[in-house]
Amino acid sequence: MKKIILFTLISLHAMAQNTMTPELLWKLGRISPLGISKDGKNIVYKVSTPSVAENKSNSKTFVLPIAGGVATEIKDSKAVLTDKNISPDGKYIVYNEEVKIDKVHGKDFYPELQKSDAQIYNGLDYRHWDTWNEGKFNHVFYKENKEGAIGIDILKGENFDSPQKPFGGDEDYIWSPDSKNILYVCKKKAGTQYAISTNTNIYQYDLATGNTTNLTEDNQGYDMAPQFSSAGNLAWLQMKRDGYEADKNDIIVAFKGMKLNLTANWDGSVDHFLWSKDGKSIYFIAAVDGTKQLFEVNFPGMTKIAVQVRQITNGDFDVNDIVGFFGDTVILTRADMNHAAEIYSFHLKKKSWTQLSHVNAATYNTLALSKTERRYVTTTDGKKMLVWVILPPNFDATKKYPTLLYCQGGPQSALTQFYSYRWNFQLMAANGYIVVAPNRRGMQGHGVAWNEQISKDWGGQVMDDYLSAIDDVAKESYVDKTRLGCVGASYGGYSVFYLAGIHNNRFKTFIAHDGVYNTQSMFGTTEEVFFNNWDFGGAYWEKDNAAAQKSYTTFNPMNLVDKWNKPILIIQGGKDFRVPIGQGQEAFQAAQLRGIKSRFLYFPEENHWVLKPQNAQIWQKEFFKWLKETL
């Protein structure tokens, strides 16, 4: 008996000595919660599992009892979920379709030349994210909820999108509680004005009259995510400033002819929200101190109760989705740097967690996990900066490890306990690297001022923040100071290109994915011009604009390429219109002509991300191959 127990313990220990690999990472199921069932007793969710062999993902839908139990696969979620697109009175259904509005193709103008593939544009917004504008726009329709009913286009003839491109879905339109109106999100600007503005509004379409009213005309920035409470009060997310996509995101409630900003005095930015069942409070998710947590803000209505924002959850994990409510519990998804998202319930009174789904438990139970540590580093201007340090599995402080400085994109995105299928810290650590991930200037979760500082200062204080982080961690005896690497994507790729010119021989190798190499050509080719207008301070031809000129000279990585002296891997997607292909090409050409060891990893059909499973595998293999060669 003792031998059996000993053998079992040894076997379990051996199982847990496996580490994450690219192959395992791309076998993990990815949860997408769909909602709470009509009877309020079950969670409905989808699991997408990549198939490398088929080069696609396969999805299955499940129901899981909230009270606990086994998940059951179902073929169709429509039977168990309330259809938000059906009007509350059941008479109508709302949906969206793409409609051809503008002439773009040469053959549209010259019918006798049908084999032409020319495209003709008179303004910007000729391409967005990863697709070219072919004159088609997303429009919201409604029709009677019966067989054979004819749909009515509520944006008929308008060359605007709702749902918003490129990522909007049916969350961009909702029914009013009385079924008399459809509310929808739309940026009613076209061409060049569309490309330079973030002024998205919430419109109300009256079914009886066909009239449309702009409910947020007084606000010049983003107005998004409309949602009614059970009491019929409308809430939405709002950013104030036109052109600033990373502005503070507040919760606004329309009440008795007023617009109440519930989060105006809270020093943070809301990710997304959900009304409580009784309509007396709103739960929302926001970044805080290197994580994403659940918050609550009360809606006072006509009472004299003060508005208060309270943080509900706390810990080294990310709360990603608010699925719904069940008694005193809220159903959420939760992830951390070692675990992909799973579904949990959180008891609001007991403050206790219960894990409900275990989609990837069988895989994680076999793995030796990396350890994540919080570290607070003093910056060059005397601030305290959070730095996540991820240590390899079975870490031994008596050994020396090669170490990677991870540069986050955005630049105003939060660096939290996220679980990425590309920039996966667990996988980097499993390959024997320590990862240093600083919450440098520009990150959400450390106050609005910290987030806003990076605009017009891309190559300034933030570069000192990076170097403060790596220098501080490199003091540890277990860091091999002769084997430091620097990696990142998007703004993180910009950071890699910039640091390659100022690192003073700290780093031995660099990897940049879809990074900005030349700020001037970036301004001339990116599609969301409002972003560069704001973050660079203006256009490169504005010679009297000191902030803009600094962005195109001092803060332009291209102007530091003569100081590059270490190997660099440059990765680029061919359909990336956010950071277009020329950025990677310019960087690679400069490195090659300067005689620097360099490699260009090109994905012709990928955008700013790498989404196809086989391409993702090559990305990982080349990433670690490069590090093995050069670090």
Predicted regions mapped to residue ranges:
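Cap/lid segment of the alpha/beta-hydrolase catalytic domain
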Residues: 190, 242, 349-351, 359-482, ...
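Residue-level detector of Asp-centered blade-edge/turn motifs that repeat once per structural unit
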Residues: 38-39, 88-89, 177-178, 229-231, ...
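Short loop/turn segments that connect beta-strands within beta-propeller blades
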Residues: 65-69, 145-148, 206-210, 255-258, ...
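Conserved beta-strand position repeated across blades of beta-propeller domains
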Residues: 35, 85, 174, 227, ...
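Non-catalytic accessory segments flanking enzyme active sites
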Residues: 94, 117-122, 127-144, 148, ...
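Hydrophobic beta-strand positions that form the internal "hydrophobic ladder"
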Residues: 40-44, 90-93, 182, 232-235, ...
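Active-site-proximal cap/loop segments of hydrolase catalytic domains
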Residues: 429, 437-631
